[in-house]
A protein has these predicted regions:
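Protein-protein interaction/assembly regions in multi-subunit complexes
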Residues: 2-230, 234, 239-254, 259-280, ...
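Extended C-terminal regions of large enzymes
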Residues: 98-100, 176, 180-197, 201-587
Length: 592
């Protein structure tokens, strides 16, 4: 259990006050620059040219990172920044999925800029406090907590007190209750006004570190987290000796973005809310299953990564099907990661009893799994026990490790075990046979502790494939063939062997093989909307352009991606309105 902290337990290092500012037509026209080494905060203006060219979100993040760095800047240099940027629509409660912010930095995995989108309350709270972006730069000399109070109008730098937890599910709870204010540690309204960015202790020992963005769940009286997961930005945060960034804000309203035509926004938002409610149960069932609804579809179409992406299907696939997760998810609690989202697809499993690690025997709330996690640490490792997936999901989150990179990396290790490249002597006794999720969990615990085989494993598949060839005499070409990464970033969880469109979606991207920009696997392989080379090439242009638009505006892609208008199929080029995957539900087996 975590202890109760009060603000008096935190040593104040510095404070800067600022004038609060209202949003006008989606913009505050300023960003906040924080130098944790100098313990300073300054406002930076946003020019009309910057707004016109870069819009917000990912665009602002990349522009600010460009201005802050030099060609020779490396990820662990003080001048590298972590930029959290919101678009003009971010936080608008009329529209489903408006809670997204984009995080940009130089990646410790690839060495080049990475961006990762994330839900939760932090981005909207920062936005409505009068900021279009936050820049974190420099390196602190002590473990530091940055507190942005958008209610009172100040930024404070605190030294992290002794005894503060390192693991996210406890740390975020301690900080939320401490910064809610004296005597307010049990007041739901005050607790809900706090959001925390942190990275767990696993990020100290691996380039796979994620940023956890917290939200206080009133119904559960507890903390939940969403991740900016790809590219290792949590590792950058820990390298800067930032224990956490805390924001406080009150007063979210229907028109906090100051839309030019709030009536039109409300009308269009209501239309989308209605379409989600009417169509979701007949299509992807996101409101009950979340992205885990993809599991049996991917297995049916030979696209579900199995045994380190060697196969795309297995007879045990139904053991991880969507209806399995629907029964495990808590259906009686709202699961949106921001106010006003009818999709509410951020499901959780409550009261899950852990079987391994430092919290063995404790019952916890597990955020997820999302499809990428269920596939990555499930079928990809030949793990078909939901409890194993939930265990790995929880510990990846609380240790601050990306589930996609961890799943792809562990799949590589298990294949190396099968090939005889790895032995008990080389893994410190850990059995990495296919399906042994407790062996995978031991790697994760050791990684978090910075010891034994976990430290080596945590370096990622690019390093491991080269290391096994040079140190263990493994066949270098074979190691390269089975190490699924691009530029050092592990591939996400779709079999792309027969999909040229998805291969391009993975390996023509600037930031490495992720599914954010060009998620074409469904359009290409399930619904057969891209029958020619020309169609695939065209999709590799328009699809990432449209997906990037969401990242500029502050919107989640899923209300568009997973709900199609009922009459969508009647229109020409329906795939350009919606990817149209819901139609496949009739072709997928369902339990009797």
């Amino acid at each position: 259990m975590s202890r109760a902290f009060d603000l008096k337990d935190f040593k104040l290092l510095a404070e800067t006050r600022f004038e609060k500012k209202e949003i006008h037509r989606g913009y505050a026209m300023r960003t906040m620059h924080v130098d944790v080494g100098a313990r300073t905060m300054k406002e930076k203006p946003v020019s009309e040219e910057m707004k016109a060219k870069f819009v917000g979100g990912k665009g602002f993040g990349l522009r600010l990172l460009w201005d802050a760095t030099r060609p020779e800047t490396r990820w662990d240099d003080p001048e590298n920044e972590i930029v959290v940027a919101m678009g003009p629509v971010c936080g608008n409660t009329n529209y489903p999925g408006s809670g997204k912010s984009l995080v940009v930095s130089l990646s410790p995995m690839t060495g080049v800029p990475i961006d990762s989108n994330v839900g939760g309350y932090f981005g909207p709270y920062l936005k409505f406090g009068g900021w279009d972006a936050l820049e974190l730069q420099g390196k602190a000399d002590v473990e530091t907590i940055v507190f942005i109070d958008n209610v009172e109008g100040f930024v404070r730098f605190y030294e992290s007190p002794a005894g503060l937890q390192e693991d996210t599910h406890l740390l975020a709870d301690e900080l939320t209750r401490a910064f809610a204010g004296s005597g307010a540690s049990d007041d739901p309204t005050e607790l809900q006004a706090i959001s925390v960015i942190s990275a767990g202790r696993g990020a100290d020992h691996s380039p796979m570190g994620v940023l956890n963005f917290s939200l206080y769940d009133r119904r559960r009286d507890g903390i939940r987290v969403k991740q900016a997961g790809r590219g290792g930005i949590g590792t950058v945060l820990r390298n800067k000796k930032i224990r956490a960034v805390v924001v406080r804000y009150k007063g979210v309203g229907q028109n906090s973005n100051d839309a030019a035509d709030p009536a039109a926004v409300q009308r269009l938002g209501l239309k989308l809310h209605r379409e989600i409610v009417q169509n979701d149960d007949k299509q992807c069932k996101m409101r009950r299953q979340g992205t885990a609804h993809l599991m049996e579809v991917m297995n049916d179409y030979d696209l579900l990564p199995t045994k380190n992406h060697k196969y795309g299907q297995d007879p045990r696939g139904p053991e991880l099907a969507s209806w399995v997760w629907e029964k495990l998810f808590s259906q009686h609690l709202p699961d949106g990661c921001w106010f006003g989202c009818t999709m509410a697809c951020a499901h959780a499993v409550d009261g899950f009893e852990l079987q391994t690690g430092p919290y063995k025997g404790q019952k916890v709330c597990v955020d997820g799994p999302e499809y990428e996690t269920a596939a990555g640490v499930g079928s990809n490792l030949y793990v078909y026990e939901p409890e194993g997936i939930l265990e790995l999901n929880f510990y990846c989150d609380t240790y601050g490790i990306d589930t996609i990179s961890f799943g792809t990396m562990t799949g590589f290790l298990m294949e190396c075990w099968e090939l005889g490249v790895l032995t008990p002597e080389r893994t410190d006794g850990i059995d990495l046979s296919w399906g042994n999720w407790k062996g995978a969990a031991q790697i994760l615990h050791d990684l978090a502790d910075g010891k034994r085989f976990g430290v080596l494993a945590g370096k990622g598949v690019k390093f491991l494939s080269e290391y096994f060839a040079s140190e263990y005499g493994a066949d270098a070409r074979l190691m390269k063939d089975i190490a699924l990464h691009g530029k050092g970033l592990e591939q996400s969880e779709y079999i792309s062997k027969e999909s040229l469109a998805q291969q391009g979606g993975y390996y023509l991207t600037n930031k490495g093989p992720q599914h954010d920009e060009a998620w074409l696997i469904f359009m290409d392989m399930v619904n057969n909307k891209l029958p020619t080379f020309e169609a695939k090439a065209e999709a590799l242009h328009y699809f990432p352009m449209f997906r990037t638009w969401f990242g500029l505006q502050g919107l989640c892609k899923l209300p568009w991606n997973d709900i199609e208008p009922a009459d969508n199929a009647k229109w020409p080029e329906s795939n350009k309105v919606q990817i149209g995957r819901a139609s496949c539900r009739e072709r997928v087996y369902h339990p009797v």
